[in-house]
Amino acid sequence: MKKNGILNRELSYLIASMGHGDILSIVDSGFPISEDVFCVDLSLIAGKPKIVEIIIPLLEELEIEKVLIAEEIKMISPKYHQKLLSIFPKNVQIEYIPHEKFKDRVRESKGVVRTGEQTSYSSVILVGGVTYHGEKEEGL
């Protein structure tokens, strides 16, 4: 039995399979998900779990270099937008794109995590990073 970290088997698999530049989408309960994209459905009831509740433990296990967010969030859900921004490390690039383009990018995901979130334009795309940089000397 796994002792700590993310316990969900499918989500753990998805995290372990992420490479540099791969896309992992965390979406609200009503977001359209293509049948040909691997989906981990964590939705339980309306509003639970929230996207932020999923992202926080994900950040403990997954290196990300960029986050994509629908630009509409700034006007439609400004309080949620500020909360979302507060959970990402300062070195992570935040990029805003129109919601229609956002939906297209989700279709390129290695996987999608559906939550119970019901805040408008709350979905995010995480772009995988790397945990090492530059030349590494081994065995020399």
UniProtKB/Swiss-Prot annotation:
Source taxon at top rank: Bacteria
Main location, first listed in the record: cytoplasm
EC identifiers of the protein: 5.4.99.62
Residues that span the membrane, as ranges: none
Pfam families, per database record: RbsD_FucU
InterPro entries: D-ribose_pyranase (IPR023064), RbsD-like_sf (IPR023750), RbsD_FucU (IPR007721)
Keyword Cytoplasm in record: yes
Sites where the protein binds substrate: 28, 99, 121-123
Keyword Cytoplasm: yes
One BP annotation, GO: D-ribose catabolic process
Cellular compartments annotated: Cytoplasm
Record: active site: 20
Assembly, per entry: Homodecamer.
Family label: Belongs to the RbsD / FucU family. RbsD subfamily.
Identification of the protein by name: D-ribose pyranase
Provenance organism: Pseudothermotoga lettingae (strain ATCC BAA-301 / DSM 14385 / NBRC 107922 / TMO) (Thermotoga lettingae)
